[in-house]
Every structure is written in structure tokens, then in C-alpha cells.
Amino acid sequence: MGSIQNTVHYCCVSRDNQIMYAYNNAGDHRNNESLAALCLEKTPPFHKWYFETRGKKTFGFLMKDDFVYFAIVDDVFKKSSVLDFLEKLRDELKEANKKNSRGSFSGSISFSNVQDQIVRRLIASLEFDHTCLPLSSPSIDGAEQSYASNSKAPLLGRSNKQDKKKGRDHAHSLRGIEIEEHRKSNDRGNVTECSNASSESATYVPRRGRSGGSQSIERKWRRQVKIVLAIDIAICLTLLGVWLAICHGIECTRS
């Protein structure tokens, strides 16, 4: 292990919170094991892979086929490189299991027969690729930082100040949304009232026109009736006068 630096501190494979294989670098074994146990208990659900950096160490997860592939590495590695390391670890362990079981791979990996030299070789490849890689572009770093911040899950806890600040920001944003919705609701109410008022005024004018027209027709009808009655009365009076003149009053009735 002379060429292997202390950059990959720990890696393991677990299933149902039971560690089936673990590689612990020649450092603080107990500290690495306790950190791994704490992180595996809080494995983020609904993720295919997940990373979080704390205290110059990156904690990487790869969830595949009911297994969790976990690693604790220094934060000098890109997250994409650590993900590639975990995927190669998964493939190498499956291949080793196939060889040990003479090709009868049943879906469950037997890690007791896996040699540490496989993991050492993968760690050496990871460190070699890191030393040969050029400086990462800002776009790649920004994308990785954006993913880490968006999918953040509190593996090792979070400070109360950050929680309070995010809570206040969330409350302010909700308050702003409520005020905006209230303003939009008032605007919609004013528009509705104006449209109702305009429609009522538009319908009110024709009603007045219809009532005025019926009243004028009624007045004309009454005037015509009065004229007809006056003509009838005049004719009746004329006939009565002629009859009285011929009969010299009411003498015709006496005979």
C-alpha cells in the first residue's frame, strides 16, 4: 500500500443496514466505522446516488439492486469520479462473486471471498485519474454544487442558524405569495364588479325604452277612444235634437 495515499478512508457494501463487506484504510478505524454506521442509518431514500461534503470529507452513496455502496473520501475528488469509483466497485464485486461461484450468480453477492486487492486497485486507479485530470471547468463544478445543494439531506446534522435562516426565508416567500394571490384576487373581483355593473346598465336602458314605448301606445289608445266616444255622443245629441224638432218635444209620445 505504499503508493496508496489516505484519500479514500473507507468504503463498504451494505444491505438492510448490515455491512456485508468493508475496506478500512490504515487510519482511524473506529472513527471511520462509526461515521459509516451513522451515515448508512440515514441513507437518503428515493435516490440512485447521493453525495455530501462535511469537514473536508465527501460521503458518497450508490443505491443499486437493494445494495448500498458507500465511501468516505477526501473532498479533493470530483463527485463524478467518486460515483465512477462506486460503480466500478459494484461491477468488480459482482464479477468476483461470479468467478467464486463458478458462474452460478443467483442475485445475492457473497462478499466473504472478495479480496482487498480489488478495492486497492480501484483506489489506485481513482488516485491516478485525479492526478492526471486537468482543472475542472466552472460549468461542471457549478453543476455538481447545484446538485449537492438541491438534493441535500442532513446526514450528520445541520446547524440551527441555517435552519432558522431557511425557515425565515421560506416564511417570507410564502408571505409574498399570499400577498400576491390576495392582490390578484382583488383585481379579479374589481374586474368582475365592473363587468357586472356595465352589463346591468346596458340592460337597464332597453327596459326603460320598452316601458316608455308601451306608455305612449297606451296614451294614443286612450286618446283615440275619447275621440270615438265624443263623436258618438255628438251624433246621439244631433239625432235627439232632430227627433225633438219633428215631434215638437214629447207630443209624439202622448199619442
From Swiss-Prot:
Keyword Coiled coil attached: yes
Topological relation to the membrane, as annotated: Single-pass type IV membrane protein
Segments crossing the lipid bilayer: 227-247
Start-end of Polar residues biased regions: 188-202
Chain ranges of the Longin domain: 12-115
GO BP terms, alphabetized: protein transport
Cellular location(s): Membrane
InterPro entries: Longin-like_dom_sf (IPR011012), Longin_dom (IPR010908), PHYL (IPR044783)
Residue span of region Disordered: 151-216
Disulphide bond pairs: none
GO CC terms, sorted: membrane
Segments of skewed composition (Basic and acidic residues): 170-187
Principal location listed in the UniProt entry: membrane
Keyword terms, alphabetized: Coiled coil, Membrane, Protein transport, Transmembrane, Transmembrane helix, Transport
Family: Belongs to the synaptobrevin family.
Function: Non-SNARE longin protein involved in membrane-trafficking machinery.
Protein name, UniProt field: Phytolongin Phyl1.2
Phylogenetic placement of the source organism: Eukaryota, Viridiplantae, Streptophyta, Embryophyta, Tracheophyta
GN (gene name): PHYL1.2
